[in-house]
Amino acid sequence: MLPTCERYGMGVIPWSPLGGGWLTGKYRRGQEIDLTSGRAGRMPQRFDPSLPGNARKLELVEQLVGVAEQAGCSLTHLAMAFVVAHPAVSAAIIGPRTMEQLTDILAGADVVLDDATLDAIDAIVPPGTNVHVDDAGWQPPAIAQAWRRRRPIGTRGA
């Protein structure tokens, strides 16, 4: 879909660039996840750390935190910059519920990821990977090519 949208100049706004909160740092290994309230309360099967898919998410989050630290940004900023680095993406949904979340997301608006950082992310979660069965979908061959998923370095900013 993304190559087609790019070819015809159609805008793309990806859904859930922060992975339902997983890419904000809210859910980390060693921290208790409240399965009785909020999104985790509504969909505990997607947040219960005792389930293998969610345990895997926690492992991946920790690896991505390391990439964010190496890049000099927060996990939230890494995730948002990753999404807008794709040449077919017009904008990213930010979806803050609080002023604190809005302030944090806006503070990362100028974060631009270099190719090494994008490669590190791809190595942790290869393109088209669905960590949780509920996220499963079809992977078109075009997303396996890094150059199709990245704006030129000078055009990656907001």
Predicted segments, located by residue:
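Aromatic-lined glycan-binding groove of carbohydrate-active enzymes
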Residues: 1-40, 74
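Terminal-tail/helix-coil boundary detector
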Residues: 7, 31, 35-70, 85-89, ...
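Structural preference for beta-strand elements that scaffold enzyme active sites
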Residues: 11-13, 90-93
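Residue-level "edge-of-site" marker
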Residues: 18, 81, 119
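Positions that flank functional sites
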Residues: 19-20, 83, 98
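Glycine- and other small-residue-rich loops at beta-strand/loop junctions that grip anionic moieties
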Residues: 53, 81, 94
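Short, surface-exposed helix-loop/turn micro-motifs enriched in polar/charged residues
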Residues: 72-75, 94, 113
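Glycine/threonine-rich phosphate-binding loop and adjacent beta-strand/alpha-helix elements that clamp
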Residues: 78
